[in-house]
From Swiss-Prot:
The keyword Membrane applies. GO terms for cellular component: plasma membrane. Its main location: membrane. GO terms for molecular function: peroxiredoxin activity. This is Uncharacterized 13.8 kDa protein in nqo9-nqo10 intergenic region. May have a role in the regulation of NDH-1 biosynthesis. Keywords: Cell membrane, Membrane. It is found in: Cell membrane. It is a peripheral membrane protein.
């Protein structure tokens, strides 16, 4: 697959999961890192990694949510974006909470509680019930 094809595929996926993400990345980082952050997240992250075969999109996002939860509070903004994306990909609030809770074994209970609090903020903002 060409880089342009991956970018176009990533652009479509990014717009489905997180409308406006590409523009937000470009607006925030483009002046400092031209042709870097948006291109990497959209082209490589979404167009190549998230679009791979082997795991469906919902599962990939649940894995991502779990990893971000285990990494701790410094990933809160990315965690919230990926919780919202997981909902858009068909994950239930319960599945997301279970993925986060599972990570208490690896990242600790404080990290899991902080991640659950971030997820609940997303659920409430999206009107998602337990």
């Amino acid at each position: 697959m060409t880089a342009d094809a991956a970018y176009q595929r990533g652009r479509a996926l990014a717009e489905h999961l997180n409308p406006g993400m590409e523009v937000a990345l470009r607006d925030r980082y483009g002046r400092w890192l031209p042709d870097a952050v948006a291109e990497t997240v959209v082209g490589h992250g979404m167009g190549e990694v998230y679009a791979r075969e082997g795991l469906d999109l919902k599962t990939r996002l649940l894995v991502t949510v779990g990893a971000l939860a285990a990494m701790g509070g410094q990933t809160r903004p990315q965690l919230k974006v990926n919780v919202a994306s997981a909902l858009r990909a068909g994950a239930s609030a319960r599945e997301i909470c279970e993925a986060i809770f599972q990570m208490h074994l690896y990242g600790g209970m404080p990290a899991a509680i902080n991640a659950l609090n971030a997820a609940i903020e997303v659920f409430e903002a999206e009107g998602t019930s337990p």
